[in-house]
A protein has these predicted regions:
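N-terminal FAD cofactor-binding segment of flavoenzymes
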Residues: 31, 53-91
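Central helical "cap/lid" subdomain
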Residues: 49, 145-201, 261
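Glycine-rich FAD pyrophosphate-binding loop
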Residues: 17, 31-57
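A conserved short coil-to-beta-strand element within the FAD-binding core of flavoproteins
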Residues: 122-137
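Core beta-strand elements of the Rossmann-like FAD/NAD(P) dinucleotide-binding domain
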Residues: 12-14, 141-150
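Short beta-strand to alpha-helix junction loop
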Residues: 68-75, 89, 93-115, 238-250
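Active-site substrate-recognition segment that forms the wall
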Residues: 187-240, 246, 250-260
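Beta1/beta-strand and adjacent pyrophosphate-binding region of the FAD-binding site
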Residues: 10-24
C-alpha cells in the first residue's frame, strides 16, 4: 500500500515499513534492503520467526510451528543456501521424492539467520495503519507513530484486516475474506523416546497431521526425549475450543493407536 501524493512535505521515517518479522517479513526486508531502501520491521513478539518457531522448556526442545521450509523462488532458494552454508540450516530427505530445509540446530535458527543485519523493533504492537497526506503512518498501541512511503503488512489476515479497517476498507475486506486451517499442537516431554518412530508420522485416518520425535530430527540439538504432535486441520477445527487436558489426552491416544507405541 502506498500513500497518496500531495504538496505536504513531511518526510517519512523510512522508505518501507514491514509489519511482522516472520519468514515473509524477513524475506521482504532483505530484498528491500538489498535494493537500497531504508526499511524497518516491526513485530509484536519477542523473537523473530512467526510460525517458524521453537520452544524450550526445562531442557526439552520442541519445534512446534512449521516443521520444515521449501523454496519456490530463486531469491529464497539463495537465502536458504546461505543459511545452510552458515550452519544455520540443513537438508532433510523426508522421502525419496521430497527434500526440504530445516533449521540447525532448531527451526528458529532460520529466521534468526534471515534477520541478521535487518533493523527490527520487537515487542511493539501496531494498532492501526493510517493514510496521511504524503505517507502512511503505523500507529502502535501507545499512540506513537512510524511513517513510511510504503507499508507491507505480513500479519495474519484477521489482524491485517483490523489494522486496515479505518483507512483502507477495501484492502481490509480482502484480508477478512481469507480463511485459515487451525492446527492443535501438543508438546510432550518424556522419560524415554527411544521406542518411538524415528521418522515423521502422518496418519490422517487417526487425525494426526504430523508427529515427530524431536531427538530424531537431523541437525538437531535436542537431547532430552520429546515428542511434538500436530493434529489434522479437520480435527483441530472441530476441537479448537477443547480444554488443554482434553486435547492432550485425545491426541496421545490417537498417536499411540497410529504408531503402535506407548507414550510415557
Amino acid at each position: 500500500m502506498s500513500a497518496a501524493t500531495n504538496t505536504t512535505t513531511t518526510p517519512p521515517d523510512y522508505d518501507l515499513l514491514i509489519i511482522g518479522a516472520g519468514i515473509a517479513g524477513l524475506a521482504a526486508g532483505r530484498m528491500a534492503q538489498r535494493a537500497g531502501y531504508s526499511v524497518m520491521l516491526i513485530d509484536k513478539g519477542r523473537r523473530v520467526g512467526g510460525r517458524v518457531s521453537t520452544r524450550r522448556s526445562d531442557g526439552f526442545m520442541f519445534n512446534h510451528g512449521a516443521q520444515y521450509i521449501t523454496a519456490r523462488t530463486d531469491e529464497f532458494t539463495e537465502a536458504l543456501a546461505a543459511a545452510t552454508s552458515a550452519g544455520m540450516a540443513g537438508n532433510w530427505q523426508l522421502d525419496p521424492a521430497k527434500n526440504v530445509v530445516i533449521g540447525a540446530p532448531m527451526m528458529r535458527a532460520i529466521p534468526g539467520f534471515l534477520a541478521d543485519g535487518l533493523p527490527i523493533q520487537q515487542n511493539r504492537r501496531i494498532a492501526r495503519i493510517s493514510r496521511q497526506a504524503d505517507h502512511i503512518a503505523c500507529i502502535d498501541t501507545e499512540g506513537d507513530a512510524l511513517r513510511a512511503g510504503q507499508v507491507i503488512c505480513t500479519a495474519p489476515a484477521p489482524q491485517t484486516a483490523t489494522l486496515l479497517a479505518s483507512d483502507f476498507p477495501a484492502l481490509a475486506a480482502t484480508a477478512a475474506s481469507a480463511t485459515y486451517a487451525p492446527c492443535v499442537t501438543i508438546m510432550l516431554g518424556l522419560a524415554d523416546d527411544s521406542h518411538l518412530p524415528a521418522t515423521p508420522l502422518h496418519a490422517p485416518q487417526h487425525d494426526i497431521g504430523w508427529a515427530m520425535r524431536e531427538t530424531a530430527r537431523p541437525h538437531v540439538a535436542s537431547t532430552r526425549p520429546a515428542l511434538t504432535i500436530q493434529a489434522s486441520a479437520e480435527w483441530s477445527a472441530a476441537h479448537i475450543n477443547d480444554t488443554d487436558d482434553t486435547s492432550i489426552a485425545q491426541l496421545i491416544d490417537k498417536y499411540q493407536l497410529a504408531s503402535g507405541c506407548s507414550v510415557g
